[in-house]
Amino acid sequence: MKNVTDSFVSLVNWPFAGSFGLNTDILATNPINLSVVLGVLIFFGKGVLSDLLDNRKLRILNSIRNSEELQRGAIERLEKARARLRKIEIEADQFRVNGYSEIEREKFNLINSTYKTLDQLENYKNETIHFEQQRAINQVRQRVFQQALQGALGTLNSCLNKELHLRTISANIGMFGAMKEITD
């Protein structure tokens, strides 16, 4: 233990080396200090700085690659969307053309069916008119016939007396009797 205490005692007895102070001579000390500090910084900082720059460079390159991949994906999606748009536009044009031709066809069919219906109605009308004319003619004929018959009956009744009537009946009976004998 004596050795340990001797060493502390010897530290106390050391002489002081000079005083601590600032050297204000710029040309004598600062360029040397600066070159030493710069040398130490360059020697030790070069590795750290190059690692930082390499990491930054890798992150930037990865970001660029990711951006390029995203750009390629976006371009592919854009091309697909444009292709779908062109396809849909073509289909829309076809629907439009087909729709117009279908409308024209339906219009033509409707006009034709309307003309056919009008022709049928015209035929029905003409048939109805003809039927009504025939009916009217038949009614007029019946009335004329009835009036002529009534007129003839009236004339016969006024012209015939009982004696003429009996003679006509007898003559007719005789004719029927002769006819009966011929047939028997």
Curated annotation (Swiss-Prot):
The keyword Membrane applies. Pfam families: ATP-synt_B (PF00430). The chain crosses the membrane at residues 27-49. The keyword Transmembrane helix applies. CDD domains: ATP-synt_Fo_b. It is found in: Plastid, Chloroplast thylakoid membrane. It is a single-pass membrane protein. GO terms for molecular function: proton-transporting ATP synthase activity, rotational mechanism. F-type ATPases have 2 components, F(1) - the catalytic core - and F(0) - the membrane proton channel. F(1) has five subunits: alpha(3), beta(3), gamma(1), delta(1), epsilon(1). F(0) has four main subunits: a(1), b(1), b'(1) and c(10-14). The alpha and beta chains form an alternating ring which encloses part of the gamma chain. F(1) is attached to F(0) by a central stalk formed by the gamma and epsilon chains, while a peripheral stalk is formed by the delta, b and b' chains. F(1)F(0) ATP synthase produces ATP from ADP in the presence of a proton or sodium gradient. F-type ATPases consist of two structural domains, F(1) containing the extramembraneous catalytic core and F(0) containing the membrane proton channel, linked together by a central stalk and a peripheral stalk. During catalysis, ATP synthesis in the catalytic domain of F(1) is coupled via a rotary mechanism of the central stalk subunits to proton translocation. Component of the F(0) channel, it forms part of the peripheral stalk, linking F(1) to F(0). In plastids the F-type ATPase is also known as CF(1)CF(0). Belongs to the ATPase B chain family. This is ATP synthase subunit b, chloroplastic. The lineage of its organism: Eukaryota, Viridiplantae, Streptophyta, Embryophyta, Tracheophyta.
